[in-house]
């Protein structure tokens, strides 16, 4: 392992420039996973996938986190970029995080010690989120909501194809997919990467795509 390894979660939303990349890559996805519920909080390891967490909470009749189902990647990755879907985002629900800094020291951040906005936070990118504590929601539990949101995803998004999820952030008061459609770029291709016909903010890899194809597109 190189002296400066890259630590990643599930590897979602990463495009490697393979010819020039000589750092070791260490994935945290095989580390011990846990989810714990108490009277007020939901505690989980950072390497739990968003979909697994959402399904667990649904099965245990814990409302408010159905929007996480189908978001690619881990809960730590979602928190680090303030991921969201269906008009919700994760950071307002975070009570605290446990992290390890580049020197191996463990520290805790409370929600009021962090700042966040649309798809961004000020969390140190060189620190690793090892656990997340979320606040339980007091809304009524809807048995059908998770499946309803999943069906909406299937209709509007190419979830069964190889992609990194949405590529571009939405600009203020508009949608990246609409702008790409308006520019006539839906279906455009570079090598093995093409813009989805179902949702223009998705770049699909047909299995032969490279980072060069991605960057050109």
Language-model features: locations:
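Anion-binding (especially nucleotide phosphate/pyrophosphate-binding) glycine-rich loop
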Residues: 1-75
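A generic local secondary-structure boundary/capping motif
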Residues: 14, 54-57, 65-69, 82-89, ...
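Short clusters of hydrophobic/aromatic residues that line enzyme substrate/ligand-binding pockets
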Residues: 34-35, 65, 79-81, 116-118, ...
């Amino acid at each position: 392992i190189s002296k400066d390894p890259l630590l990643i979660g599930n590897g979602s939303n990463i495009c490697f420039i393979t010819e020039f990349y000589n750092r070791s890559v260490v994935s945290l996805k095989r580390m011990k996973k846990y989810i714990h519920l108490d009277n007020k909080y939901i505690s989980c390891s950072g390497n739990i996938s968003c979909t697994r967490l959402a399904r667990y909470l649904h099965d245990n009749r814990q409302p408010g986190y159905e929007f996480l189902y189908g978001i690619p990647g881990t809960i730590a990755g979602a928190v680090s970029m303030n991921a969201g879907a269906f008009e919700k985002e994760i950071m307002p629900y975070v009570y605290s995080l446990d992290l390890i800094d580049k020197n191996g020291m463990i520290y805790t951040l409370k929600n009021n010690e962090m700042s966040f906005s649309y798809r961004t936070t000020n969390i140190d990118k060189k620190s690793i989120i090892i656990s997340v504590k979320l606040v339980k929601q007091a809304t009524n539990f809807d048995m059908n909501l998770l499946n309803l949101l999943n069906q909406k995803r299937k209709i509007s998004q190419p979830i069964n194809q190889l992609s990194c999820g949405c590529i571009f952030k939405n600009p203020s008061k508009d949608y990246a997919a609409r702008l790409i459609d308006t520019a006539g770029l839906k279906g455009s291709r570079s090598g093995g990467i093409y813009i989805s016909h179902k949702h223009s903010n998705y770049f699909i890899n047909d299995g032969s795509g490279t980072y060069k194809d991605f960057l050109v597109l």
